[in-house]
Structure formats: C-alpha cells, structure tokens
C-alpha cells in the first residue's frame, strides 16, 4: 500500500523556485490582509463575484455547464435546478458555501470529507454521495488516433478507507511540525487525495473544495475574492500536465510532488496578483470605484479595452467603467485608440 510521508518537506532540499513562490505569496497575503481591514465593502463585492466564477469554473472543468444567467440565479437566488447539470452545480454551491462560512470548524478529517461530498452530490440524487467507491476505477486518456489507454490506476476500492485514514493521519502529523511550510504541504495532500480517487464521482471537484478549505484554514484566502477554480480552468492544460507528472510512480512511492506543488502555488500566486491589481490606486486615497478604474488605466503600460478593465475589476459595473473612461478622455488624461470592439485606452 502507498505510504504517506511528508518528511521530505523538512529536509531543506527544496527547489529554489518553490521557495521564491512561497515568499512572494506571503508578501501579497500580508498586503491583502491590510486592505481587507480597510476596504471591507470591496472585498464583500469581490467575494460575491468570485463565488459565481468558482462554481461555474469548477464544474466546467468536468464538463458540467449551463448558461451564465442560470449559474447566477442558482448561486445568488437559490434558484431550483432545471436539469441534471444544474443539480450538480447547486450541490457544489452548497459545499462551497459551507467552506466559506464554516472553514474554521471543518478539517481534513474523513467525517468532514464524506459530509462535504454528500452535500455536493445531494441535489443530483446520487445514492453514493458521502460514501467511498465500492468498485475500482481507472483514469483513461485518449490519444490523437482516438485510442483509449489507462493513464493511472487509483487505489483499489477495498483499500480506499484505509488509505484515506492514513492520508488523514499523515497530514495531521505533518501539520503539527513547525518546520514544514503549510503552503508546500497542502498540494502534497491534495495530490495524494486525487491519486487515491476515493469516490465513484466528484473527485476533481472535491479536490478543489479541499484545496480551498486547507488554504483558508492557513490564512491564504485569495481564492475567496479571485476565483481559484477559474484560474485552474483557464490553465487546465498545465494543471493536468502537473498532475500527470506528479502521479507517475505514485503507486510505488516513487513520484515527485514538485510539479503539482508548483502548479497549485502558481495558481494561488495568480489569485493574489489579480487581487493586487484591483487595488492599483494612489496610496492614501479612499478607494472609490472611479479611482480604481482611473488607476487601472493610468498604471497600465499597454492599452486596455473596456472588457479588460471589467475583468480586472469585476465588482465595478460596465456602465461605471464606460462613464469613467469617457470622462478621462474628455479631460485628456487618456486617449482612445481604435473604434468599436477594438477600442482601447492608454495614458497620454
């Protein structure tokens, strides 16, 4: 059986790029904490936007989709699901809300993991929600010619409860070691969870929920305000390649965690960088939405479209962005380049 041992994180032989990533994340985390205390309303608005994006993206990765309008209604208005996909989405909404509101009281324990899985699967009516798999599963891949082959064989169903018990204990043991950086430990645990593949269905979505849970519990909550799952979805080819590399040799305890660690930390770093962009204003001033739009354009080295500004500042309405840009063009602080959908704005 697979042995779960994270002591290598304490031997000082870590790649320099991972050490640098953790340092950069820590610095951005400190800045975000200061801003959160000062700009509570902005963070509340960002959280509402990110929640919709997270629920949409985490399900989309698994091919579970519906319209943006329906996603918003399910998330913000508790609209009843109209079909199977929407039932899956509603279940993820409930599990994510549970983590957002109660992460301090939830832990990486089998009981909590099973409860979150049951919650996630409940709307879709699956009988196996909250239960470990009873049949063995395999991870398939399809080559360019359409041929299927087994890419990975997860832990057999008969060994899954024991493997999950050992994973839980190994994590709790490593977590209590003050010399182990939690940012490096979390990706290792998530990788092992994915390789066990403990459930018949929903393992990928559960891995993202558990990633957020462990990050939040350790104070790294950028994923609340900039969708962690959307970043994964945007760069999912890199995610799956890192997962492939780190799972190679897993069954025989010969795998390297480093590719997956780098991918998860890079995703978290992008969340913090995006969050930082949304506060790109002159220090000392009250951050109004108008000031944030102005600063976003004035601090950019390249021309920006209205759509790009709206993506950077998702809590600011397109109408507000358009009004501010129009005023800036009139005052001469920026100039308009192009026309129609190709219109961009750049500092004069």
Model-derived features with residue positions:
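FIC/Doc superfamily catalytic core
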Residues: 1-348
């Amino acid at each position: 059986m697979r042995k779960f041992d994270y002591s290598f994180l304490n031997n000082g032989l870590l790649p320099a790029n991972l050490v640098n990533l953790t340092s950069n994340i820590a610095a951005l985390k400190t800045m975000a904490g200061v801003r959160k205390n000062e700009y509570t309303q902005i963070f509340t608005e960002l959280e509402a936007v990110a929640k919709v994006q997270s629920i949409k993206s985490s399900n989309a990765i698994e091919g579970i989709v519906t319209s943006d309008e329906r996603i918003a209604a399910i998330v913000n208005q508790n609209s009843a699901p109209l079909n199977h996909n929407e039932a899956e989405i509603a279940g993820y909404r409930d599990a994510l809300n549970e983590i957002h509101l109660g992460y301090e009281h939830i832990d990486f324990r089998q009981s909590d993991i099973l409860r979150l899985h049951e919650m996630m699967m409940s709307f879709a009516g699956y009988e196996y929600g909250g239960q470990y798999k009873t049949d063995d599963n395999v991870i398939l891949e399809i080559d360019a010619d359409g041929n299927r082959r087994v890419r990975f064989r997860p832990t057999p169903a008969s060994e899954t409860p024991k493997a999950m018990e050992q994973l839980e204990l190994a994590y709790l043991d490593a977590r209590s070691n003050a010399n182990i950086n939690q940012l490096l430990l979390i990706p290792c645990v998530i990788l092992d969870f994915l390789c066990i593949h403990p459930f018949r269905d929903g393992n990928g979505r559960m891995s993202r929920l558990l990633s957020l849970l462990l990050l939040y519990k350790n104070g790294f909550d950028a994923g609340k305000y900039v969708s962690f799952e959307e970043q994964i979805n945007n760069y999912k080819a890199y995610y799956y390649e890192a997962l492939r590399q780190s799972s190679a040799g897993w069954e025989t305890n010969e795998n390297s965690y480093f590719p997956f660690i780098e991918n998860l930390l890079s995703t978290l770093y992008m969340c913090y960088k995006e969050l930082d962009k949304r506060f790109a204003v002159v220090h000392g001033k009250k951050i109004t939405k108008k000031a944030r739009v102005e600063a976003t354009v004035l601090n950019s080295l390249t021309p920006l479209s209205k759509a790009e500004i709206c993506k950077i500042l998702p809590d600011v309405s397109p109408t507000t962005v358009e009004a501010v840009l129009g005023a800036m063009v009139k005052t001469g602080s920026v100039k308009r380049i192009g026309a129609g959908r190709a219109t961009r704005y750049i500092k004069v």
